Regions:
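Short amphipathic alpha-helix that is part of the acyltransferase structural core
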Residues: 1-26, 114, 118-150
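Conserved donor-binding loop and adjoining core beta-sheet/short helix segment
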Residues: 2-5, 16, 22-82, 175-186, ...
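Acyl-donor-binding surface of acyltransferase catalytic domains
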Residues: 50-51, 58-126, 251
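Flexible, substrate/cofactor-facing loop regions flanked by secondary structure
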Residues: 122-187, 191
């Protein structure tokens, strides 16, 4: 079958392909939202008119974010001829890293676990949490900046769902969302963090539980990511009812001068 490359602009066509592995492709599906779609370049490999591989380059952040999906052998021409990013953060399946390394030198490689929640398996964890809003943005930024390495942007608070725990007027724990897409029925939990002095008290569980409960009330599919080596966090999520869907790889890549 003859392989060809094309640029994708039709959301319906893109979504149809991403839906073949919806829970792996949740971030890419979220990028179909109008505010994010304008930052995206989509390219695909096709055989006999059927999409077999996809490369998304999201240019709304620096450096670019690249998502790969589909047959590894059909990703090669996309990485070689369609993707122009000199450097980027990549997300791909473990079996796709070999073809990626042909074109990019990878560092900061980490295996992540995509965890998903069956609503019937959800086990709520109650605690002294409250909903966070715009007035809490500076507290959130301070908590993340001073004590953690958490990527947070204020728009996530405006558009998402965040809960927190306070002690003596200070925000000491929080959980929120990376992305909420009601159009595509997705809620991606993230930005979970507890002040070092307040760990071991179950605050991560109660904050995450509150976020999940609100997302489920909106009939959204709920997912999150956790590092494969972060067993402690994975146990927290498992107790809430999450289970591992698939491993994937995150890495920073710099394009090789010659391939």
């Amino acid at each position: 079958m003859v392989l060809s490359i094309k640029r994708l602009e039709d959301k319906a066509e893109i979504y149809a392909f991403l839906s073949e592995d919806r829970l792996y492709a949740v971030y890419a599906i979220g990028d179909l939202e109008p505010a994010l779609f304008r930052h995206c370049d989509w390219h695909a490999s096709t055989r006999n008119g059927r999409l077999t591989a996809l490369c998304l380059c999201f240019k709304g952040l620096v450096p670019d974010r690249v998502f790969l999906m589909g047959a590894s052998e059909d990703l090669a021409p996309l990485l070689d001829g369609s993707l122009e990013a000199p450097r980027a953060y990549f997300a791909c399946l473990p079996e796709q890293t070999s073809v990626l390394r042909r074109f990019y030198s990878l560092t900061r490689t980490e295996v992540m676990l995509r965890m998903v929640l069956d609503p019937q398996e959800f086990v709520p964890c109650d605690g002294p949490v409250h909903r966070l809003g715009a007035r809490h943005v500076h507290q959130l930024q301070d908590l993340y900046r001073r004590y953690g390495d958490v990527a947070f942007a204020p728009y996530q608070l405006d558009q998402g769902v965040f809960y927190g725990v306070e002690q003596d007027g200070e925000l000491v724990a929080t959980a929120g969302t990376h992305l909420v897409s009601r159009a595509y029925s997705l809620g991606i939990v993230g930005n979970v963090f507890t002040h070092p002095d307040y760990r071991g008290l179950g605050y991560a569980s109660v904050c995450t539980s509150a976020v999940v409960e609100e997302l489920l009330a909106q009939s959204l599919d709920v997912v999150l990511n956790v590092g494969q080596t972060n067993g402690r966090a994975a146990k927290v999520y498992e107790r809430l009812g999450f289970h591992v869907y698939c491993p994937f790889v995150e890495a920073f890549g710099v394009r090789r001068e010659s391939v």
